[in-house]
Each structure stands twice: as structure tokens, then as C-alpha cells.
Amino acid sequence: MRRVLFTCSIVILLAASVSAQKTKPWTEWTAKDADKILNDSAWGQTQSEGDSSSRPDSTSAITQTTAARESSVKNAGAAANVESGEKKAGVALYYRVRLLSAKPIRAAFVRLIEIQGAPPEKVAQWRAFVDRDFGDYIVVTITLDGSTDRKRMGMVMAEIGNVDAEALKATTYLERKDGKRVALMEYRAPTDVLGAKFVFPRTLDGKPFIAADSGELRFSTEAGKVLKISKRFKVSEMMYEGKLEY
């Protein structure tokens, strides 16, 4: 009985945390709030490879190197120079899959930079990135962190950086619960801390690809022998500021 009550309490606390992130302004998010949006939410998911028992929690996951912090502060003119932070080393390799075209993801990036000490005037410049209109596109990003196996990390990064963009179109797509898909339009290899970018059309047959009743959105990609990602996002949880964000 105690175990059941404890489990129920955890579920309630998690639900309350998610609700708080959606109701309070992003400018008031804590580091943990922003980290959860980036890595464990309707817009950001984590796929692990290896021993996930050493996976960093929300608190340790937002730590970053001094060099990374200084780099992000210096490059205020580029929206891409925003990061969620380097994670503490672990055995597992973590693929962070995020819907960059969703406002909460962009807001979380900028909020973390603000919390980490960027000058107010720089943060003000970055806020334009939060409100950016992605128009007719859905953009998914992938970043990697967490592994002490530098060889493995290097192999994966090389695969992501050198993948044939045209060949990738045959193995990369977004899929709804009903099985309908949109294929990859464009691939951009990682050139900044936002990671590799996968660009998809926002419409299918003249209608928005995602609607409130779509159930779920699945991102799938496969490249070479080392990269295979498949993550699902719950559409019912994508409402933010009265709008379906994806």
C-alpha cells in the first residue's frame, strides 16, 4: 500500500511540474524547468545508448563547461549559440531529440543562457529567436552528450556530420499515429550547439500535418551503421499559450 501511495505521489508531483512549466512565463522558468522541456517533454525527448543507470538527473544535466558558457555569451548575434549545457560524463550516450520549431524548446535554450549569466542586453537579442516564425516547416534537431567513450562519440559525430543528405531522405520521416508521413526536405549538418537539423514540410495535402487529434508524432532517422533514432512525441501535450506548438 505504501509503495502504491508513493508511486501516486510521484506521478502527481511530475504532473504538477509539467503544468507549472506551461502556465508560468518562460522567463520565470528555473533551470530544472528548462532542462525538462529540452530533454523530457512533449517537445524534447532523450534516447540513450549503453548503460543508462548513470544517466544524470535534471540538476546535474544542466552543468556546462566554462568554455561553452563563454562561447555562447560572446556570440549573441546568432540564435544558434544557445545550449542546454554539457552533461556530466557517464557511460551512456544520449541523443537529445528536439522540436526546434516549437516555441517552448527555443524558450528553454534562451532561459538557460540567461540563468547561466549572460548579460541582459544579450538575452534581449536572443529573445527574437524565441518568437521566430518557422513558417511552413517543422524542424527537428539532434545533439549528443554523456559518453566517456570518445571513440564511440567521435564515430557518431562523424556519421552525423558527413551523412549524405540525399540518402538520408530515404530513411528519415515524421509519422502520425494514423501512419501518414512527411519525408525529410532538407538536412543541415551540425555547425553550432543546436546540433544537426532535419527540416520537414509543415503540411500534407494542403492541411497542417499535425492537429490536436493526431495522437502522436514520431521522428525516425537512420544513417550508416551507427545512427538509428526513433522518438515519439505526445501531441495532446503540445499545447502552449493556447496554441499547438510543434
Descriptions of predicted regions:
Residues 6-7, 73:
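General helical structural elements
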Residues 21-246:
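PEST-like low-complexity, intrinsically disordered acidic/proline/serine-rich tracts
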Residues 1-5:
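Positively charged n-region of N-terminal signal peptides that target proteins for export
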Residues 7-16:
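Bacterial N-terminal signal peptides
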